[in-house]
Amino acid sequence: VWGRALGWYMATSALVAQILPEGRFKEEITDYAVSLAKCLVEFQDKEDGMWYQVVDKGNKKDNWKESSCTCLFTFGICKLIQMGVLDDKKYTDAAKKAYNTIIREYIGEENDDVFVKNVCMGTGVGDYDYYISRPIKDNDLHGTGAFTLMATQYYKTFEESGGHNER
């Protein structure tokens, strides 16, 4: 499963779940988003909290850690935590680990410019070999947008609340 495609599904599911009026559709979308978050945490790299370009093949030697999907997954998990529908401490830990690794290892700086590193360039539909052979780029807008969403939501979830969303 290609990371960024699934990342957008995670992010938009969480956003839609938040804005829908109470009722069956809100409940169904929320359940989908929560189920996806629970599944994604199982594929997260246990050491640094990143996700792979091909999410369900992290054990393959040629697969690589991709920042835009990690940002989108972290955004969705943080949104669900903020909504109060994902309240197990392991999800808070997963979000914090991913966020801190992105900040520490995947943000670059050069000539007063700040950018996101290790982003898969634009991608069409393909198989495993296609996805892992895609060019890796620094300062690609796919990463910048995903990072901005993640950082803003992380702040709203954990900082703006004064830590009240800590689980």
Region annotations inferred by a language model:
Residues 1-11, 71-73, 147:
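Alpha-helical bundle segments that constitute or directly flank the non-heme di-iron/ferroxidase center
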Residues 10-58, 62:
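Oxyanion-binding "anion nests"
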Residues 62-65, 69, 74-167:
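CBM-like carbohydrate-recognition segments
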Residues 1, 8, 32, 94, ...:
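Soluble or luminal CAZymes and related metallo-dependent hydrolases
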